[in-house]
Amino acid sequence: MIDSHELRRRDSYLNKLIGFQDTEPVKVITGIRRCGKSSLLKLMVQHLKDTGVLPEQIIEMNFESFDFHKMSADDVYRYVKERIIAGKRMYLFFDELQRIKAWEDAVNAFRVDFDCDIYVTGSNAYLLSSEYATYLSGRCVEIKMLPLSFREFLDFHGFDVRETQSALGWLRKQVFDKNNERYELREVFAAYMRFGGMPGIADVGLEQEKVLALLDGIYSTVVIRDILERETRRGQKQITDPALLRKIILFLADNIGSSVSIASIGNTLVNEGLLDDGKRKGTPSAHTVQAYVNALLES
């Protein structure tokens, strides 16, 4: 069963899911790792229970759990079939189902064999969002989930925006935290721009050292490991060097707004000694750099 903890609502996404409830397409929630997809599934499960759906009508499977991660598609099908209640509509929730080989066969079989409403999450570590419709024969609707908006950032961190009046009568918006300490709106927005909108930040507060440590872990997982793993599964043998990928990312980030070419990326990295790690000899080919840049664009 999907584990539970304190859930913070993401109403804009939850309302989209509710709008597609009990419709034929498979609901696929996509987005970057750690952006809140699993929590959205839990919110939808809670909504169903609050509106009268019985717990036994809901089947939840999290494929990051040790209970399920070694299952085959046949195992998943049998697990669900054993829990189907005849004459009842079932609600199936699959978190990171794409870890299972031939997962789409099981999902398509559920649609044919049972009266069910299906919800699936998937990160870019396994499939690009454009690939889901292909695997599900076009019978899916995608909910693209993003990190927190600024409004959500305020809510998650317990900030309250109030309109106050200055001594001269001017109205302005100020922000108050849970302890009623007051901040200028631009201060909080600066924190949002610096730390970003990953929901997990709310669990550690806005202490810079903790936040940066958390973000570094997310960056290493999302940008480096996920891209390398996905491209390896897709047979892209050129994309195997995490150091080169990280350097290309840093180069592109440092040159936002500038015109750069594929050739200039490799040349600059070598000329500035950024690839002098004792492993890579010479300038990476334009074809190799292009493959890494394409992987970043698609992720």
Label for each model-derived stretch:
Residues S4-D22:
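Pre-Walker A adenine-sensing motif
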Residues I29:
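Hydrophobic anchor at the beta1->P-loop junction of P-loop NTPases
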Residues K37:
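Conserved lysine of the Walker
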Residues L40, M44:
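Hydrophobic positions on the alpha1 helix immediately C-terminal to the Walker A/P-loop
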Residues I59-K88:
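Short glycine-rich substrate-engagement loop in P-loop NTPases that contacts/grips substrate
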Residues D117-S123, K144, F153:
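Structural recognition of the conserved hydrophobic beta-strand(s) that form the central parallel beta-sheet
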Residues Y126-E142, L154-F159:
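Short regulatory helix/loop adjacent to the ATP-binding pocket of P-loop NTPases
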Residues V161-S299:
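Interdomain hinge/linker elements that couple catalytic modules in large macromolecular machines
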